[in-house]
């Protein structure tokens, strides 16, 4: 059963197009729910009504086309290493190559009030833009035809609440702000939408 499910996830990574999209964010239905609590002073059961977020009935909110692979600049090797430690298969380009990819342009960024591993949490809104780029040797390539594809999308799609952008590991800023190397308005992750042969070498997860 587990092996069959993993094989299905890998096969979907090779199947691009309609019906095989990436769900980035979801919305849940809010409902009233009655809960029985213990009244602290008397110790008697008390029924209260609460707002209940029904995550089991969550509906897709932001959906994007399923990419063939994600690409990440070699300067973010520490982020790539985090992915490989989680079991994600990664490769690196052996030589520079020009590719047509989808890039994320940050339209809005709101900084949170909490820290995660010394990073401020972010909530971002992006738009996807098609462009041709030269990717240098050492660029990380994360194919979606692997068992960890679902986790990979959660980690790399910027709007995902659990993404590296949301957690502050990939610094970004809103488009139109003063450009900064530390916080660019273009997310340093790119979506390769067509199957291509790339000259790559495997990345050692150690």
Residue ranges and their predicted role:
Residues 1-101:
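Hard-cation-handling environments
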Residues 7-28, 110-116, 171-174, 188-192, ...:
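Short, charged low-complexity intrinsically disordered segments located at boundaries
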Residues 48-51, 118-122, 177-178:
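A short linear-motif detector with a strong N-terminal bias
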Residues 58, 63, 80-139, 143:
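Substrate-recognition/cap regions that form aromatic- and gly/pro-loop-enriched pockets
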Residues 70-74, 138-146:
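Short, hydrophobic/proline-enriched secondary-structure or compact coil segments at domain edges
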Residues 147-152, 156-206:
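Accessory, solvent-exposed terminal regions and/or long lumenal/extracellular loops of proteins
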């Amino acid at each position: 059963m587990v092996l069959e499910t993993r094989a299905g996830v890998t096969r979907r990574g090779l199947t691009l197009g309609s019906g095989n999209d990436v769900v980035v964010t979801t919305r849940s239905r809010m409902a009233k729910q009655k809960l029985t609590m213990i009244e602290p002073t008397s110790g008697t059961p008390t029924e209260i009504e609460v707002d209940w977020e029904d995550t089991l009935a969550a509906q897709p909110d932001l959906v994007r086309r399923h990419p063939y692979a994600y690409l990440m600049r070699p300067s973010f090797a520490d982020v790539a290493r985090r992915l490989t430690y989680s079991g994600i298969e990664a490769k690196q380009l052996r030589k520079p190559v020009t590719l047509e990819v989808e890039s994320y342009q940050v339209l809005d960024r709101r900084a949170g009030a909490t820290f995660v591993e010394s990073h401020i949490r972010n909530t971002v809104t992006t738009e996807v833009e098609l462009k041709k780029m030269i990717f240098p040797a050492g660029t990380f390539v994360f194919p979606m035809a692997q068992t960890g594809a679902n986790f990979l999308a959660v980690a790399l799609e910027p709007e995902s609440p659990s993404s590296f952008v949301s957690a502050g590991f990939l610094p970004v800023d809103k488009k139109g702000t003063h450009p900064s190397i530390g916080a660019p308005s273009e997310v340093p992750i790119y979506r390769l939408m067509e199957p291509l042969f790339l000259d790559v070498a495997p990345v050692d997860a150690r």
